[in-house]
Amino acid sequence: MAQLKILHQRLGVNIDHVATLRNARGGTHPDPLRAAMLIAEGGGEGVTAHLREDRRHITDYDIERLKAECPLPLNFEMAATDEMLAIARRVRPHAACLVPEKRAERTTESGLDVVRVEDALRPIVDGLAAIDCRVSLFIDPEPAQLAAAKRLGAPVVELHTGTYCETAESARAAELARLQRAATFATDLGIECHAGHGLDFATTGPVAGIPEIVELNIGHFLIGEAIFSGFVPTITRMRHLMDEARAPLATASRQ
């Protein structure tokens, strides 16, 4: 079996909650585009924004501005609907991540059940691929979900790390192992593996140390921490934490 090549791990930052803070009072401040510029300055390599059906935080105009003016690739989080596909066709983001969406939820509560909605997802996945948009599916780290993603032809999956982050520290090793197995299976299937949801300074290192995971997407924690420490220092600290977690992998791969 060929040795796994250890790839640089990208940091994508979700800026939804910059818009949440703006919308709490109305107006234009704080501006998600300005946040995206600071993310680039701090070492982030992508910006994620979720345009929800109810437009509770990010707006259509935000998506248009981010695509037109942000120096980083835009990862457009979207429900698998005809409306969102039409917006993606108009805006042409670098990537689109399909996520489940419920009006009553505060945040995304689980991964997309690709097994159950595989047929409904197919025209959305194909439509995004037709505009050269990199498609990812936000899924729980389960073999059946990965197999369904492969059948759909999705080139990327993002593993839902929420259960790992919310589990008591004494039981977290089992959830980390579950993520590792899923990442290995994804790679064996030829699917690029990302991860995210609920990660913070305490929980990111072990996930960043999974060799097959080449991108982490982190949002709420970084936006909250930036209120106290500033955007650039917060992003830079997370970037360094990820690099430290990957360093032993790179060293081992050279030996």
Predicted segment positions?
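Conserved N-terminal beta1-alpha1 strand-loop-helix module at the mouth
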Residues: 1-77, 81-93, 148-151, 174
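Hydrophobic faces of well-ordered beta-strands that scaffold small-molecule active sites
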Residues: 9-15, 47-49, 74-78, 96-98, ...
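Active-site mouth loops of central-metabolism enzymes
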Residues: 14-32, 73-80, 107-115, 129-141, ...
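N-terminal active-site wall of soluble small-molecule enzyme domains
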Residues: 51-127, 145, 159-162, 179-185
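C-terminal helical cap(s) of enzyme catalytic domains, especially alpha/beta-barrels
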Residues: 67, 110, 171-172, 225-248
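Glycine-rich phosphate-binding active-site loops on the catalytic face of alpha/beta enzymes
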Residues: 97-105, 156-168, 212-231
